[in-house]
């Protein structure tokens, strides 16, 4: 067992993970990094799955759902960064978001009030959805909000947790690597 291997919550989540990957292909997408269910010693529960990367389109039904599984959907856009922001904001969820760009103006727009409408917005680094010390709780249909604790007054303002990676490296959450 690898230290990065973590189980999904239960067998129902494993089934949802498998169905999500099937749905990507059914809708015309491509699986770039194949996932799958891990088995053998240390994986007896049947709840361990491999991360997957899928190329999809913004109008795919599966992209509009929150799958709670280690699946990264790659969505292409063209034109100004506002087009990418529109694609990203056009879902009902709003926990976390990220953009990869070398353009500082694009990065700043993504992090501005005209940009990502998620609770966490990162530039040039992925997101785990639970950055330590950040404004946790999500936006839109994600999470239960932040009003149950010391963040009660903050409901009256729009907050984001932002990260900009200025290096040439692209570190992934929890040290995950995809050797392609």
Each model region followed by its residue ranges:
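Glycine- and other small-residue-rich loops at beta-strand/loop junctions that grip anionic moieties
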Residues: 6-9, 99
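Short, solvent-exposed loop/turn elements at beta->coil junctions and helix N-caps
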Residues: 35-42, 126
């Amino acid at each position: 067992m690898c230290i990065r291997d973590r189980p999904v919550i239960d067998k129902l989540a494993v089934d949802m993970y498998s169905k999500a990957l099937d749905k990507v292909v059914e809708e015309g997408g491509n699986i770039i990094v194949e996932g799958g269910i891990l088995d053998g010693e240390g994986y007896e529960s049947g709840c361990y799955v491999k991360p997957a990367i899928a190329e999809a389109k913004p109008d795919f039904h599966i992209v509009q759902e929150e799958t709670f599984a280690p699946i990264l959907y790659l969505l292409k856009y063209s034109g100004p960064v506002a087009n990418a922001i529109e694609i990203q904001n056009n879902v009902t969820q709003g926990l976390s978001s990220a953009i990869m760009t070398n353009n500082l103006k694009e990065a700043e727009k993504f992090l501005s009030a005209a940009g990502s409408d998620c609770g966490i917005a990162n530039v040039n680094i992925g997101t785990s959805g639970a950055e330590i010390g950040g404004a946790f709780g999500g936006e839109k249909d994600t999470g239960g909000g932040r009003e149950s604790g010391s963040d009660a007054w903050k409901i009256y303002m729009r907050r984001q947790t932002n990260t900009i990676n200025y290096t040439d490296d692209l570190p992934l959450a929890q040290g995950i690597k995809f050797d392609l």
